[in-house]
């Protein structure tokens, strides 16, 4: 399925107050795509909020330094965005993956669209914008920026590079193709620094890791004594 980009542009141009949502148990493609899309839409003067069904996992908090991704019922309530006129669901086409946001979306009256690369879907009552050949929704977001005439900035490029890199196993999976590298190059030109993103993803010491290492070392010392 190919995205109808002229129709996508029409939908975006008609909206002013937009909510972005992705799936529970979020990964970098989900979170990075939400943040990248938020930057794209805000460049057009749109008001944007990101509201998901679960908090950002500890190991992925680096991707959202401004804490823009809100958790429903913890950081924000449904009544706080009743004034939205568009809800974009990214990186999923299934109710079950939306967690507590599913009922919020079901009960809402604003327009809903799905922006996704997965083949499977259920009966979410939303207009579909899907590219099932895309290796990541992050790549679709770059296409969206081009469709909407938005220049890639670091705030857009960094999360979208993380989205694509992680959903392709850091460019090792068979889903990687020529356009993947072309898109990655655009994101580098926009300000993404792969070495920094890789370090934040895989080499940063979390508090949990430090505590675990301390526990292991303490046990070793006890046994030696």
Q: What do these predicted ranges mean?
A:
Residues 46, 110, 192:
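Short phosphate-binding/catalytic loops that engage adenosine nucleotides
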Residues 70-127:
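Active-site cofactor/cluster-binding pocket
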